[in-house]
């Protein structure tokens, strides 16, 4: 099939989708989204804030016109929109009129994307793939193809033959939230008292020095364990593969598993996850990973499985095996293709 893909290049997931489709023998054309705030000059952003709204309108219109011209030139079978950040109603309507299948793959919940916004887009979409399984209920009257499709892991980053030394006892990579900070403060206290190595990656505080000082004051035990920067998928994979235990702490508004779940399973580390995330058959609780009900139980899990390496490896290996043929990006895209070819 011929795919025309558009999306943001953040975090590397779009690149993984492109490589996986190409490796499967599909023709793939990519046109990146250029969001106004991340691509225009500082002065244009300032003028926009001062009321020159036409700057953004002109920017987005020019991007849409170029995308439509490229779609017409490439004549794909499928236009695949990743996450839909710049998918306007006018663009969706224009793409639907070209006769190509128009697929929206959401990488966040419908609540964040906008339920009303999605409702207006639906008449022009051939297929919608959702991040949260519960969001399928919001599409019950939608007559097009729909499926629950969480992001798969990048197989190229988790080569089974690679042999990384597991020199990190506990790791977590992600963005800050109130619940995550509460959990990690507790984990940091445990790691410090038990002389365990802990790695926490992500942008946890602003680069301005007073923000760093404020974070250090509020989280004095956690602070030394934090590497305060955004890690690439490659860097995150290296950390996970070096870890004995990886924590998966979900966001309050999300109920289905996040993409990190499959990356952690693929890494061969033992995954310990909060019980608020529904596995939806993508992994087995107590078999492939552990889920904790409260912080005391989480600390008990960490302490026990760091002390019993054999027990840790048993669960980690089961999770890695179960995950391999079910949750890779290749397997996930196969699900999407089946829905498009045999709806």
Regions found by a protein language model. Name each.
Residues 1-51, 59-66, 82-83, 89, ...:
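Nucleotide-sugar donor-binding catalytic core of glycosyltransferases
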Residues 307-338:
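A charged, aromatic-enriched C-terminal amphipathic alpha-helix characteristic of glycosyltransferases
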Residues 71, 75-77:
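Proline-aspartate-enriched helix->loop->beta-strand connector
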